[in-house]
């Protein structure tokens, strides 16, 4: 051995921080909290006073026979300004779940990406996926970590949708879970829900259109109609923008196909049908 040769060269593992070599849980979030706590969402110091940051707006979820879906508008606002017209607010987080985000956009995006890694990390280490309740609880725990930011006005409100592969009845296996800013989680048993600034109008629309026995195409149409109604009354929610070719984002989750993003071409067809229909009947 050369006297100039370091031990880290001969034993590369010794160059790793202790956190990488210490046995722990199968939670990637727990590992990150020890190895690099500054990377955790909500761990950074919160500035005093109001902070102007882009906010995502309206997300809807509804169940149908054999699954569940998420749909969201594409607008992000900052105060009274439109910060972005084509923001993506829906994310597939594993084979049978997806999350829509409303609230402070930057923190929400960081949180949902870490959440997707958390689910993948658990599955790789344990060899099985988390149960649907386990997935929902993981997101609640992460949301609790942002409480300081939420109290300073940087709140995040995710909406979780998943297909319960262990359900007795696959036709009723779609699940929706909502959260509050403190990390409280709530199973939405009514079959539909909405979060964000236009949620009041979207839920009112879904109350009239929701059908638990609908097929996936009918449910998708109902979701886009609800987003249109929200945009009609809420300035922070963006409706279908045909001139800019910006359409709602939609993710469907079923037992056969898993979590699948509806192609933009199909979303464009549905949005165009809704807009044309409202020309004849503005109230829907």
Swiss-Prot record:
Q: Which InterPro entries match?
A: Ntn_hydrolases_N, Proteasome_sua/b, Proteasome_suB-type, PSB_actinobac
Superkingdom of the organism of origin: Bacteria
Propeptide positions: 1-56
> Is Protease given among the entry's keywords?
yes
User: What is the reaction catalyzed?
Assistant: Cleavage of peptide bonds with very broad specificity
Q: Tell me which residues this entry annotates as catalytic.
A: 57 (nucleophile)
Cellular component terms (Gene Ontology): cytoplasm; proteasome core complex, beta-subunit complex
Q: Name the Gene3D superfamilies on file.
A: Glutamine Phosphoribosylpyrophosphate, subunit 1, domain 1 (3.60.20.10)
- Places the protein is found: Cytoplasm
Q: Top-level EC class, please?
A: hydrolase
Q: Which GO terms describe its biological process?
A: modification-dependent protein catabolic process; proteasomal protein catabolic process
| MF-aspect GO terms | threonine-type endopeptidase activity
State the pathway, as annotated in the record.
Answer: Protein degradation; proteasomal Pup-dependent pathway
Per the UniProt entry, the Enzyme Commission number(s) are 3.4.25.1
Cite the record's note on assembly.
The 20S proteasome core is composed of 14 alpha and 14 beta subunits that assemble into four stacked heptameric rings, resulting in a barrel-shaped structure. The two inner rings, each composed of seven catalytic beta subunits, are sandwiched by two outer rings, each composed of seven alpha subunits. The catalytic chamber with the active sites is on the inside of the barrel. Has a gated structure, the ends of the cylinder being occluded by the N-termini of the alpha-subunits. Is capped by the proteasome-associated ATPase, ARC.
Q: What does this protein do?
A: Component of the proteasome core, a large protease complex with broad specificity involved in protein degradation.
As for family, the record states: Belongs to the peptidase T1B family.
Which HAMAP family has this protein been placed in? Answer: Proteasome_B_B
- What is the name of this protein? Proteasome subunit beta
């Amino acid at each position: 051995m050369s006297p100039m040769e370091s031990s880290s060269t001969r034993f590369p593992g010794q160059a790793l921080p202790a956190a990488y070599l210490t046995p722990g849980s199968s939670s990637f979030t727990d590992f990150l909290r020890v190895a690099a706590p500054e990377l955790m969402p909500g761990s950074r110091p919160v500035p005093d006073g109001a902070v102007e940051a882009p906010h995502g707006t309206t997300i809807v979820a509804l169940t149908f026979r054999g699954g569940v879906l998420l749909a969201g508008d594409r607008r992000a606002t900052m105060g009274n300004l439109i910060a972005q017209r084509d923001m993506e607010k829906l994310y597939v987080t594993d084979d049978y779940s997806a999350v829509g985000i409303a609230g402070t956009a930057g923190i929400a995006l960081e949180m949902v990406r870490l959440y997707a890694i958390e689910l993948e990390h658990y599955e790789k280490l344990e060899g099985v996926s988390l149960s649907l309740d386990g997935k929902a609880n993981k997101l609640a725990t992460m949301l609790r970590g942002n409480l300081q930011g939420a109290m300073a006005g940087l709140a995040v409100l995710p909406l979780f949708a998943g297909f319960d592969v262990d359900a007795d009845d696959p036709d009723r296996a779609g699940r929706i879970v909502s959260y509050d800013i403190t990390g409280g989680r709530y199973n939405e048993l009514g079959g539909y829900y909405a979060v964000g600034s236009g949620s009041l109008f979207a839920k009112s629309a879904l109350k009239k259109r929701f059908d638990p026995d609908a097929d996936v195409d009918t449910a998708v149409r109902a979701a886009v109609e609800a987003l249109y109604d929200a945009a009609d009354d809420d300035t922070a929610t963006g409706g279908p923008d045909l001139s800019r070719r910006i359409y709602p984002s939609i993710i469907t989750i079923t037992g056969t196909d898993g979590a699948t993003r509806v192609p933009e071409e199909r979303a464009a067809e549905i949005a165009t049908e809704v807009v044309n229909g409202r020309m004849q009947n503005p109230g829907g």
